Amino acid sequence: MLQLGPVGLNTATLGTGITTLTEPSRVTIGSSFMRGVLDNVTTPPLEALFHGQAWGGKNYDALKKGGTSGVYEKVLAQAASIFAARPLAIYKGVSCIHGEQDGLDNNTAYAVDLAEWQADFETDLQAITGQTEDIPLFICQAGSASGYGYTSGIATVAFPSQLQQLVAHKANSKIHLVCPKYQLDYYDHSHITNDAQRLLGEYYAKAFAVVEAGGTWEPLRPTTIVGAGSTVTISFTGRVGNLAFDTTLVASATNYGFAYKDDSSRTITGVSIVNNQVVITLSGTIGANPLVSYAYNNGAGGAANQVAGLGARGNLRDSDTAVSAFDGARLYNWCVIFRESVA
């Protein structure tokens, strides 16, 4: 990392010298992410460097290239310092944890913004290092809608950034959605704990290792949602091992986090896993304009409920055997938040 790092806050400027990565009292994903890179990639680099800039409560327009915060330009200045000290350094990716303010701002074009962010970073970092390799963007899904009081569930599109992050992943091969965050612990309405930051960094490392090896990273997400009669069957990609409903690591949610809506006011009478597909049984034949959502604005609102693990959430995960290098916790792939039409 750079001196005074790993991440500069607000207007703070990091030093220009490189030093050992150590975490401040408010932990970043940096240490666990870089440790995971060194442990998990097929050909580990001689050195892994992590740096960045953060400013809480800022939307994309403030943080983007030319934005009012100057955050983007500080990251590029940091990159120039690193390249001056390590002339052979190249960038393998940009990690981003963002989306809450754009959710509050009802930014329905956030997927387009993420594509612009990736393209700008790739162009400008390539200009610094001289590399021709792609520089993908790794993101996670905002998981604090309920913490901000959004609890209307499937009925309305609100706090859209969490859905837009999934759109960006599906639409752009250089944007990788690592995971949701409802399975992590929060210390207030929107911020995860230090231990959760360490776990999140390990999730980033998992995704990075797949991409670095030339593979295609997929979070656990739906690929098809098909209705027939009074049932909806959902197929998934990104699964390692069998699907499971886990009400131990994530507090039990109504219908395991799934919700349904159509013009005939059908309701869910059962949710089950059959042959690693989720089958939703309804109170009657599927009506017009059917929708299914998962972990979407379905929690109890406010900071206290977010901290208690009762915010927006779901219980669907896979059976990945990967474990945390810090505490041995299983790094299951948890299903992303979604709200989609039934075919």
Regions found by a protein language model. Name each.
Residues 1-343:
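Cell-envelope and extracellular/periplasmic
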